[in-house]
Amino acid sequence: LRTGVVIFLLYFVVFLAVYPGFFVYDAQEEYLEVVTRSFTTHHPLFHVLMLGGIVQLVYKLTGSVNLGIAAYTLLQMAALSLIFRYFIWKLGEHGLRKRGQWILTLYLGICPPLVMFSLCSAKDGLFMGMLLIQVLLLLDLCEDVEAFWADRKKMLLFAVSAILMMLFRHNGCYAFL
């Protein structure tokens, strides 16, 4: 859990500089779909409802759209920090030593594209996180097929991450196949 907290805190430093986060390109359209209740198939409905729902909920409670965007950004930062923590843990299971784990933790916390993905309200960051979980679980599956299918937690995580990956991007189905 410590590595996830470190990554989150490194992201948080940048978050303070770019408060409330990067509400860019698709996010504005997605938010307006929720506000106006006129949905299209251009953006994945799941992400539209998640992003717009969180921003609108916080707006209704506080009167501030910026706080809503910040809430969404912080939740996404937390999710990606936990996913990267899982990634580091899995590499540790495969022999990555503590020193390497800490170097990777720092890299994941300061690598500019990854920091931007965590602070950007576009669907790409969460899609990338689900794809990473899929890759890690597929490696487990390839290493020991019987053990993988006997582990209910892994099967559940595989199913949930696959479904979310497909819900976050229209081309997620193709990535899964």
Model-based region annotation:
Residues L119-L126:
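Short acidic/glycine- and proline-prone juxtamembrane loop motifs at membrane-interface regions
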Residues Y86, L126-E146, A162:
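Specific aromatic-rich, kink-prone transmembrane helix
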Residues R2, F87-I110, M128-G129, F148-R152:
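Transmembrane-helix signature of polytopic, membrane-embedded enzymes
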Residues I7, Q101-P112, A162, M166:
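Short helix- or helix-capping micro-motifs
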Residues K154-R169:
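Membrane-interface alpha helices of multi-pass inner-membrane proteins
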Residues V18-E30, S38-I54, G63:
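Extracytoplasmic catalytic/substrate-binding loops of multi-pass membrane glycan-assembly enzymes
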Residues R2-F23:
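Transmembrane signal-anchor helices characteristic of membrane glycosylation enzymes that use polyprenol
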Residues A71-G95:
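Transmembrane-helix motifs of polytopic, lipid-linked glycan transferases
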